[in-house]
């Protein structure tokens, strides 16, 4: 039986609101759980500076003590997680597909490294990064096309693919916390950068779909179900339906 998440609604309400452009939600990239956690904190820092600004210097900091407090770690564990995750950002890029630039089967895209600098100050107990300035517009000055959720909604998720799926669902979440969205399997594999073996439906179902749905149901305030949509004998889409546990208990 899946573990049921214990949701503290007051803490959830007071938790930082993570807001990012839908372009970033739909982008192709692969990050670890700890890298995703840091990205959430960076997004929060950038938007707290002034959500109306069109420019930001891109310099963000992570205090070891604060990170440890947020994610329930010791200082040593937090410092190790931060150090390893930041180091592993090297060589990783985020890809934004540009359909208007497509030519035949060849896709148009823009690809960016996440950071242009990272630093560590042991004497102050903090790490800092300089986010690629080309990425700043995806975090600030957002008008209509954005995805939002509370940090507390995702902090217990351990699977980075479940984090990506949760963001995709939140992109289509209604004000009452419910939603239905159909995602193409090929799109999920491409944008979440899943292993090539997941193109086989049994592997996709067992290693991605079931694992992520179970984790979201047990570790977030979302209650999620799905059906597989077929074209002939081939499964092509996954249709997700979800509700927020708050609406389920108060509605």
Swiss-Prot record:
Signal peptide: none
Keyword Nucleus: no
Alphabetized GO MF terms: DNA binding; DNA-directed DNA polymerase activity
GO biological process, any: plasmid maintenance
Pfam families assigned to the protein according to its UniProt record, in alphabetical order: Rep3_C (PF21205), Rep3_N (PF01051)
Record carries keyword Zinc: no
Region (Dimerization) residue spans: 1-144
DNA-binding region positions on the chain: 75-83, 200-207
Subunit structure and binding partners: Monomer and homodimer.
Family: Belongs to the initiator RepB protein family.
Protein name listed in UniProt: Replication initiation protein
Upper taxonomic lineage: Bacteria, Pseudomonadati, Pseudomonadota, Gammaproteobacteria, Enterobacterales
Underlying gene: repE
